[in-house]
Amino acid sequence: MHMNISEIYPSSNKIYINCTLYPDVKVGMRQINIRNSSQRFLLYDTAGPYTDCDIKVNLTEGISSIRRDWIARRNDTYPIRKAKTNSDARGVKALSGDDRVILKGIAGGAPVTQLFYAKKGIITPEMEYVAVRENALLEQAEAIPGLLLPTKTRKITPEFVREEVACGRAVIPSNINHPESEPMIIGRNFLVKINANIGNSAVLSNIEDEVKKMVLAVTYGADTVMDLSTGHDIHNIRELIVRNSPVPIGTVPIYQALNKVNGIVGDLSFEVFKETIIEQAEQGVDYFTIHAGVLKSYIEHTRSRTTGIVSRGGAIMAQWCLLHNKENFLYENFEEICEIMRSYDVTFSLGDGLRPGSINDANDVAQFLELRTLGELVKIARAHDCQVIVEGPGHVPMHLIEENVKKQLDFCDEAPFYTLGPLTTDIAPGYDHITSAIGAAMIGWYGTAMLCYVTPKEHLGLPNAEDVKAGVISYKIAAHAADLAKGNPASFARDYALSQARYDFRWEDQFNLSIDPATAKKLHDESLPGKGGKTAHFCSMCGPKFCSMKLSKALND
């Protein structure tokens, strides 16, 4: 599959920046060519090969493994076996081939996690990659004449990245079995990131559709993708997604574990869950949402809620606890889970199984009891040299959002916060990409490191490709707005460049510098089509006599 970059991002091309510590490492960026000028504008690019016109991607073969040699050079892993694909896989058979070997950290040896290396003072290729990726945008901002930066630029160096990872304020999700991924960093001292959820259901299940959603999501800017499949072919869908994804892939393993016991919650066990996370770690999943903070004693606090327990994983574990009258087996066996995670460098995403699912339930006792427990689990994970982030709500009115961030930073020792929205009102089914983007922008400003998108289909059905696009774009806007509020110079540079184009009536540049150029151009051309509309010093809103910018330019002239 090859995304047509000239249609999605006109006047753009892919460039590669060489690293210094690791000269063989090249960082891909997208470059916009400013019309009638030698100027170029650099952008962070999450799309990997999909925005490189010189690379044709065949989804049945997977994308290139850029990290394979980096991992091999560390000499701390060993091959378990060659990968196998189920014989009934549709369109997946060619993926695993003879060349993919499943890796694991050497038995009895040190962890193979980015956190372990960082604590040892080692700057890995992954760390330099993310430093170059983020710092190139800061250098560009500093070099733009006339741009008034809100704060002094703090250079993002490989050493700064290492320090942030070492203290747990940032993570670089990098499973050793996902060498196709381009390193990215999640932490509040870096650009705010976004995640896109995809995956089938028992009602709608199609492998090809889910892979295309992933490609669409990363092309429009998703920094990570979660496969939340609960229907048929879970293993094969995930295989095709991981092998073709240039961004980290996350999952909620309890979904597949439940699928293995035919959907009967009472038949779940730690043994089934353990088998599932090993299977997924061997495939290359970069982070797992694990609902280990849903303790049996907390469940009673949800009984008076308006909407009860709305997390699927949280509801599954709560039901299991009550059926067996036992403590959550994910909590009870957490240290054993850590041993597995550190052998593959799978990052913990500690799930908020008791998050509020309605405005009336926001910031209640159950939510914050679980958050305290997640803070305890953060310390245990770090003691095992596992990378860890913490998930957050949910449905929260605007005036209660900041409290969530303050408590999370306090309870969870500044582990990166990863929130679903939050949705700021319950009254807009069909528009929850908007209700949640409002909350996402605010919580990102307050310090959340990654925002999980919400699509227009939230609460209504399984998102299709257009819903995925709408969700990603809504959240790219929210993340960018948060970065502006935090004073990130890279974000100010893009606003400045677009505003200059707008004031100069450079319509094509204005389209191309936007988050969704095709939509901007389409809306403009509905009333002023053709070449003449691209040179006009007005739009159809004001016309030639009432355009404020045209009048303002006349004053200056």
Curated annotation (Swiss-Prot):
The record's listing under InterPro entries reads: ThiC (IPR037509), ThiC-associated_dom (IPR025747), ThiC/Bza_core_dom (IPR038521), ThiC/BzaA/B (IPR002817)
Question: Which reaction is the catalytic activity of this chain?
Answer: 5-amino-1-(5-phospho-beta-D-ribosyl)imidazole + S-adenosyl-L-methionine = 4-amino-2-methyl-5-(phosphooxymethyl)pyrimidine + CO + 5'-deoxyadenosine + formate + L-methionine + 3 H(+)
EC class: lyase
Q: Which gene encodes it?
A: thiC
Q: Which organism is it from?
A: Anaplasma phagocytophilum (strain HZ)
Which residues are substrate-binding? 197, 226, 255, 291, 311-313, 352-355, 391, 418
Recorded GO terms, molecular function? 4 iron, 4 sulfur cluster binding; carbon-carbon lyase activity; zinc ion binding
Pathway, per UniProt?
Answer: Cofactor biosynthesis; thiamine diphosphate biosynthesis
Describe its function: Catalyzes the synthesis of the hydroxymethylpyrimidine phosphate (HMP-P) moiety of thiamine from aminoimidazole ribotide (AIR) in a radical S-adenosyl-L-methionine (SAM)-dependent reaction.
Assigned EC number = 4.1.99.17
Which domain of life does the UniProt lineage start with?
Answer: Bacteria
Record keywords: 4Fe-4S, Iron, Iron-sulfur, Lyase, Metal-binding, S-adenosyl-L-methionine, Thiamine biosynthesis, Zinc
Q: What are the required cofactors? A: [4Fe-4S] cluster
Record protein name field:
Phosphomethylpyrimidine synthase
Quaternary structure note: Homodimer.
Binding-site residues, Zn(2+): 395, 459
Instruction: Tell me one Pfam family matched here.
Output: ThiC-associated
Q: Does the keyword 4Fe-4S apply?
A: yes
Cofactor stoichiometry and binding remark: Binds 1 [4Fe-4S] cluster per subunit. The cluster is coordinated with 3 cysteines and an exchangeable S-adenosyl-L-methionine.
A Gene Ontology biological process noted in the UniProt record is: thiamine diphosphate biosynthetic process
Amino-acid positions noted as binding [4Fe-4S] cluster in the UniProt annotation, renumbered to this chain: 539, 542, 547
